[in-house]
Amino acid sequence: MRKDETSNTSPDISAAQPASALRYQLRPPRRNDGAAIHQLVSECPPLDLNSLYAYLLLCEHHAHTCVVAESPGGRIDGFVSAYLLPTRPDVLFVWQVAVHSRARGHRLGRAMLGHILERQECRHVRHLETTVGPDNQASRRTFAGLAGERGAHVSEQPFFDRQAFGGADHDDEMLLRIGPFTHPPH
């Protein structure tokens, strides 16, 4: 068991977070969370559902840069998958932000992202990068809010166009770059 799995303390969620976000325990995912995470993502369109194996690997190999939001009843209602870029370790790449419909509207996604950035393993991160589809306004609001909390700039550029996805019906993906992070949230 990793030392960070034993903590039952509540996360330090910014005062800007609604009280309803406080009911969730934010923690690194565990290997046995893989199936619940897979189920959660399947219930969060338009997110791309990856294989259960991929979520198990994220729980096992990238727990230090991923987070789950667990309800008092033990249900996983939120998940963020992220990793440090191997060639630029001061950049956190966020792969997916999943928040179940029953937990939306409470800035849980932003709280989970902030929780990852506050971990000791991510204190050196100066930029966050992620991709979003052009019509995903909820994700854009989440990342803009995080940038505002941290006094950071958001830039956008093309990343993957629809041709990169082969014959799949997939929108273009734009790269959002947030940073530099110069101070903790207010």
From Swiss-Prot:
User: What top-tier enzyme class does this entry carry?
Assistant: transferase
Q: Where are the transmembrane segments?
A: none
Which N-terminal stretch is annotated as signal sequence?
Answer: none
Which GO molecular function, any one, fits this protein according to its record?
Answer: diaminobutyrate acetyltransferase activity
- State the EC number(s): 2.3.1.178
* UniProt family annotation: Belongs to the acetyltransferase family. EctA subfamily.
NCBIfam families noted in UniProt: ectoine_EctA
Provide the protein name.
L-2,4-diaminobutyric acid acetyltransferase
This protein's species is: Bordetella bronchiseptica (strain ATCC BAA-588 / NCTC 13252 / RB50)
